[in-house]
Amino acid sequence: QVSGETEKHKTYVDLTNEAKRQIGKRPVISYFLDGSRHTYKVDDISYNKKVYPVIAGQVGIGCCKRTDGRMRPEKFYRRLVLSLPTVSNADGWKDDVFFAAQTKKLNKSEELKKLGIEFATILPYSPPKDQKNGKMEDSGIARIQDYMIESEKEMVAELVKAGKLNQDNYLLKDGSLEYKPMKSGREDLRTLQKIKHNYKWVIGVSKSFNPESILDHTGKANANYIADLPLFHRTPVARYENASYLGDVKFGVWYIRIRDKKYTRTPFDGVIKVEKIMMDEEKDTGIDSEEIDLISATLINERTPTCYGTDKRWANHLYPVFLTESYVKSQYMSTEMFLHLF
């Protein structure tokens, strides 16, 4: 297994001193991005004696910027969407043309205009082979989930275009960067190959992960590798690829323990998973280990000053990410108001 970083570490890397050195300096992570969606089944429609659910969703994508230790909203999308079965386009039009026309028609409604509300799009879902009601609903929700991911990619592309991201201003995206290829949505955002250069200064940080899928630096599955990770240490960077799912995009993946094991429920709590997409020049050499140490020490210093009461994930929270999540949630329309539209 080829190492995912320039230093060929064989064991955990202690970041305690590096993290202390970074305290008081301006952190290199300046932007924090979080996306979420709320979905609701709002109706049923019938075609050819079959009943299909109508799914409505609110998608929220927020990015906050930290300047001089203060967090401020940088960008926000709130997008209202509907998901309808493909069979609702019975006239043989192309789906994108038909559903774009329906969206336009919907937005002309006096009631929506009065409220100053617009739907961003209507997303067609293909009914699954197993047409049990729950499964149908899942197909509609999956389309809204895909749309949320596309909106996240769009926001990253806008930040890059505006020249906001560089070696002193990384973006932390909440969650994984392992985006599967999309069959629908914007052509230029569908595959990672097309957009990977937008991710030069982006890291993905996951608060939870499947311990079964953990690879050590030799490429072997090894959950104990993380369970035994000492406080403020990171694992060597493993190289991760999945050609059938992610194409020829390679990742550096590593884990950092930000909380002492003795205070957490399980040995995996208090550990975060970090991903970075390898740029072309890093595919042979791996990602610069100094860059990995700097990012990791910065993440250790981001851990929360408090725990959040009932949130079981408190041990894995990073404070600016928590603030960004809270900001996104605060921008949602209330469930009553949203459902009242239908």
Question: Whereabouts are the PLM-identified features?
Answer:
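Short acidic, Gly/Ser-rich segments with clustered Asp/Glu that frequently serve as metal-coordination loops
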Residues: 35-43
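Active-site cofactor/substrate anionic-group-binding motifs, chiefly glycine-
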Residues: 55-68
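Covalent nucleotidyltransferase core used to form phosphodiester bonds in nucleic acids
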Residues: 45-55
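Short hydrophobic beta-strand that contains or immediately precedes a catalytic carboxylate
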Residues: 31-33
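Conserved catalytic motifs of the protein kinase core domain
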Residues: 28
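Long, contiguous domain-sized segments
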Residues: 1-8, 12-24, 42-45, 67-342
